[in-house]
Amino acid sequence: MQYSAIVGINWGDEGKGRMVDLLTAEYDCVVRYQGGGNAGHTVVNDHGKFALHLIPSGIFRDGVVNILGNGVALDSENLWQEIETLRLAGVKITPDNLMISDRASLLMPWHRLQDELEELRLRDKKYGSTKQGIAPFYADKYQKKTLLAGELNYPDSLREHLKEILGWKNLTLTGVYGAEPVREEQIKAWIEEYGEKIRPFIRDTAKILRRLRDEGKSILFEAQLGALRDLDFGIVPYTTSSNALAAYAPVGSGLTDLRLDQVIGVVKAYSTCVGEGPFVCEMLGPEAAALREAGAEYGAKTGRPRRVGPVDLVATRYGVKIQGATAIALTKLDVLSYMEKIPVCTAYEIDGERTEEFPFPVLLDRANPVVEYVDGWHCDISGARIWADLPEAARNYVERIERAVGCPIRYVSVGPERDAIIRR
């Protein structure tokens, strides 16, 4: 397929990074089109194990162009630290294989500060922010109060624009939160250090993408987080502040007339969730601890223990629909190998009524999971490489999910390594 998107179907952390790393062998370009450094895509390959927060997961493939699109929250400090980490591991990163849209807005130090202050203000009603400044950043973007990456090439204009925005931002920091104002000298020093480092990577990437398309090149669009964290269709207000859907790829990349040929939705073989908000099928106690340890379920960015539960067919079916998924990659099937019986959430019960439809967000706190148990396979499947290698119980489990969500499962991962994948 010439134009494909890889997206999350659930709450994020489904394994999108490992799928992009695998599939980049088939693509010429990888584009991150939304989100920022608030989540991580874990990739395991010959270079080592990495949690990529901003850099597209195609960075490990020779000859692949990696682009951060205009829809990304561009944190130049975190981006530069990520570049240095990868270079130390022997990964080649130059302006030829990593490009930043000149239309991407800069996430500034005051965005992280405001994020922390807002979480403190909310106290027990906090949203579980990673405190990377994402919500304040996107709020400012839609108020037209951000600096564009391309402005780094025009220092006189940047200086005037910075002064204007900083004066406005300090009204919020001092008036709403009672914080000290951010000093202009401090921000100028930050820009001189990190803005100058990323400036060679800044290009008119929309123009480059149009050229690649005209040359017949294949492009893979990499989303952050998952459908249930989408700003419009997720579990509001416990969402991210950008659109995590495949439908946003044309806008967030700058290739505005794009028509995707394929949308690969990534689903974990069980459910995980980082942060606050309703999580209907959540496991607690020793059962949760066992699954969390088996899957090493800790946040790639924060290290926070992830909430865990059985695969949620209600939420997954909804995620498949709003993502417009044409195929599914089911990840971490091997993690369930320790279970004699595997729980599956098949429906919700709300106020005494059973439903298989994902409800409006305000009803989620009143929803209880309807759980059934299926036979486990209770053996190591990490060496399986073709469908027939899997035990019958594992194949039955995959096919049950496939039937329930109405979308073909084309990939099944049985380990973190690049080749630990079954194609169907």
Model-derived features: positions:
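Non-transmembrane, aqueous-exposed alpha-helical and coiled segments at domain scale
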Residues: 1-424
